[in-house]
From Swiss-Prot:
GO biological process: translation
Organism of origin: Lotus japonicus (Lotus corniculatus var. japonicus)
A GO MF term: structural constituent of ribosome
Keywords: Chloroplast, Plastid, Ribonucleoprotein, Ribosomal protein
Protein name: Small ribosomal subunit protein uS2c
Keyword hit for Ribonucleoprotein: yes
Gene that this sequence comes from: rps2
Pfam families found in the cross-reference section: Ribosomal_S2
Main subcellular location of this protein, as a coarse class: plastid
Subcellular location: Plastid, Chloroplast
Length: 236
């Protein structure tokens, strides 16, 4: 895999607050190599490590995108939800930003069945078929459609398991991460000082609470994916 330059600067990371970890009482000792110091009761993340692993992650997603691989971005906490949706849409990736339904990947047959139902209901709504039903039946199906849109809207075009999963908050998305580990799907994980860096294939140490920090990491990854897609189209 060729190493590329992704213009990751310390200035922009500092400005986004990427270096601010959790309080020193709330930490995982496995994160020690990724912490540079303690300041006012807070662990400060080593941005040299952040730049290194973010660059590695960008190389990985560029390479995967240039070969037509499929991505899933997961981030369901309130602060990350909109950022995840916007990033995924920009990069033409699938995403989950509301709630991770247990077994979404490990029980793919059930997920596929739900997606099929979702697509059928969307088609019926667009063609006006739902409005031709008795009011009670139409109301039930519209509620079902709304529920499916909320939880599966970001993966409605997914036809198989993703090749790489990007996870915004390891603690919040632990179930999703475990499913990826079970299935052997490579993961890129944004990890704060209370996380376990050994669980993901590439762990990017960074503040997972600040919107600016999450946005910066996602923007770098999305740019790399978009560049990879462009390379794939040129060579197709």
């Amino acid at each position: 895999m060729t190493k590329r330059y992704w213009n990751i600067t310390f200035e922009e990371m500092m400005e986004a607050g990427v270096h601010f970890g959790h309080g020193t009482r709330k930490w995982n000792p496995k994160m020690a190599p990724y912490i540079s110091m303690k300041r006012k009761g807070i662990h400060i993340i080593n941005l040299t490590r952040t730049a290194r692993f973010l660059s590695e992650a960008c190389d990985l997603v560029f390479d995967a995108a240039s070969r037509g691989k499929r991505f899933l971005i997961v981030g369901t906490k309130k602060k990350a939800a909109d950022l995840v949706a916007r990033a995924a849409i920009r990069a033409r990736c699938h995403y989950v930003n509301k709630k991770w339904l247990g077994g979404m990947l490990t029980n793919w047959y059930t997920t596929e069945t739900r997606l099929r139902k979702f697509r059928e209901l969307r088609t019926e709504q667009k063609t006006g078929k739902l409005n031709c039903l008795p009011k009670r039946d139409a109301a039930i199906l519209k509620r079902q459609l709304s529920h499916l849109e909320t939880y599966l809207g970001g993966i409605k075009y997914m036809t198989g398991l993703p090749d790489i999963v990007i996870i915004v908050d390891q603690q919040e998305e632990y179930t999703a991460l475990r499913e990826c580990i079970t299935l052997g799907i490579p993961t890129i994980c944004l990890i704060d000082t209370n996380c376990d860096p050994d669980l993901a294939d590439i762990s990017i140490p960074a503040n997972d609470d600040a919107i600016a920090s999450i946005r910066l990491i996602l923007n770098k990854l999305v740019f790399a994916i978009c560049e990879g897609h462009s390379s794939y189209i040129r060579n197709f």
